[in-house]
C-alpha cells in the first residue's frame, strides 16, 4: 500500500468487491440532529482503488483521499484492518 500524508482517512466496511481493482466502502458517521439534538447515524458509500484486489466483502478497511482516479474513484485503500468471518 502507499504512504499517505495529510490526507483524510476513513474507516468503513466493504460492501462490494465485484469490480476489478475497485471496492465500495460504506462509512458510518454520527451527527447531531440540528433541531432535536439526537445523535443520528449517517452512512455514505465511496469507491476506492484496490490495486491488488486484497479487500473482500465484509472486511473493515481504511481508505484515504487521493487524486481522482476515475469519474467516481477518489480514494485509495490504505489497509485492511479486520477480515470478515466466513460463515
UniProtKB/Swiss-Prot annotation:
GO terms for biological process: translation. GO terms for molecular function: rRNA binding; structural constituent of ribosome. It comes from the Bacteria. One of its GO terms (cellular component) is cytosolic small ribosomal subunit. Keywords: Ribonucleoprotein, Ribosomal protein, RNA-binding, rRNA-binding. The keyword rRNA-binding applies. The keyword rRNA-binding applies. InterPro entries: NA-bd_OB-fold (IPR012340), Ribosomal_uS17 (IPR000266), Ribosomal_uS17_bact/chlr (IPR019984), Ribosomal_uS17_CS (IPR019979). Belongs to the universal ribosomal protein uS17 family. One of the primary rRNA binding proteins, it binds specifically to the 5'-end of 16S ribosomal RNA. Part of the 30S ribosomal subunit. This is Small ribosomal subunit protein uS17.
